[in-house]
Amino acid sequence: MSLSRRRFIQATGATLAASALPLQAQAAETPVALPIPPLLESRRGQPLFLTLQRLHWTFAAGRRAATWGINGGYLGPTVRVYNGDDVNIIYNNRLTEPVAMTVSGLQVPGTLMGGAARMMSPGADWSPVLPIRQTAGTCWYHANTPNRMAPHIYNGLAGLWLVEDAVSKVLPLPNHYGVDDFPLIIQDKRLDNFGQPVYNPPASGGFLGDTLLVNGAQSPFVEVSRGWVRLRLLNASNSRCYQLQLSDGRAMHVVAGDQGFLPAPVPVIRLSLAPGERREILIDMSKGEEVAITAGEAAGLMDRVRGFFEPSSILVNTTVLTLKPTGLLPLVTDNLPMRLLSDQLIDGGISRTREFSLGGSTPDINGALWNMSRNDFQSLQGSFERWIVHTNTPQAFHIQGVAFLIKRVNGNTPLPEDQGWKDTVWVDNEVELLVWFPQVAPDHFPYLYYSQTLEMADRGAAGQFVVRPQSVG
């Protein structure tokens, strides 16, 4: 029987459309195991080496791409330190341009925070000794290079930094790294037809890619035992905020935010993850059913075809990670703890109120662009301040060297999963924060606050402040 003209056009059109799909759309169909960054731990005063370098990585099946990374891999190893340690970090810049590094969420003096005051020229080192004096939390280390933070993080200069303490060691939570406790660094990129990342920042706003990567892989899977699985999430994207959920509609249990545990686990069906934000979740895999974490709706066929001809900000595939349970259910399984913190979150009297207006079309804060030689204000160590942050352009906001509680979101009580100590917050209109200043930052080593839309921060949406020590006597 002859093929009708209509069926011929339909068949050839579908074939052409499939062949025209961007490489990332085709590669996403190939299952790949979740890359798990090596674990780098502080032990007995031995230094931890972090080498910033060029390397090759496979972002799309069968295509090796030139990129950056740390210690030989795309992104960096997971650093794990312990409260009470003094950790000697040795950064070595083997790249061909200056780089500055920092650890977001770490409560250390401004002299040790990194950033513009600690630039590393090509071939240079920076080796701070960091006193770890804070409770358990999931921080992250990353490039903090003035005016170049966005491309440097996009290129791969980032990794997780875990702080453990006496409480986290004894809580009945999964804690076997790479077995039932996994780091997930989420990014969006744009890949060309050779699998090479492309970075073309927009004239305004932040960069949005069309390819979702987790630890540098598209739509990865991981095999897990039947029981509770712990995922430490970091949104290392330049500007995209994710709405995460499980493919079968079951609940995730949020146990921690940026700087520590929540008072108790919070079950959620949908979870927001802003740029720079970290969350820890538990997923019950005891039923032995495969489940995927997703980040919204994927692009349709025409969106994919259109993406072949022009840059797209619609994600081709929105699968973050597929969990595949293996083995038999253990005879004894741990129950989810009813409480995570024995004490209520403590806040103090407010010493003053500050207001911040984050720009949109103009990348400024309170009408001013970042100036390395200008400190915008000073605060007092140990004090609490009320910060009210406004914007007409939704974006994340980060503060170095502090911890804060979200008190109000657009006049309302924050969601239960947002009621722990944090350093990064999504701002869509207005948030009210109670900010605590645990460390000192002198004039020449101030802390930064900035838009976590990295392109906007690079253009000037940042400020800096000093923290004076409490007077004695």
Curated annotation (Swiss-Prot):
GO function term, MF aspect, one: oxidoreductase activity
Record-level GO BP terms: FtsZ-dependent cytokinesis
Keyword Protease part of the UniProt annotation: no
The organism's place on the tree of life at top rank: Bacteria
Keywords carried by this UniProt record: Cell cycle, Cell division, Periplasm, Signal
Any Gene Ontology CC annotation: cell division site
Family note: Belongs to the FtsP family.
Biological function: Cell division protein that is required for growth during stress conditions. May be involved in protecting or stabilizing the divisomal assembly under conditions of stress.
The protein's name in its UniProt record: Cell division protein FtsP
Organism of provenance: Sodalis glossinidius (strain morsitans)
Gene field: ftsP
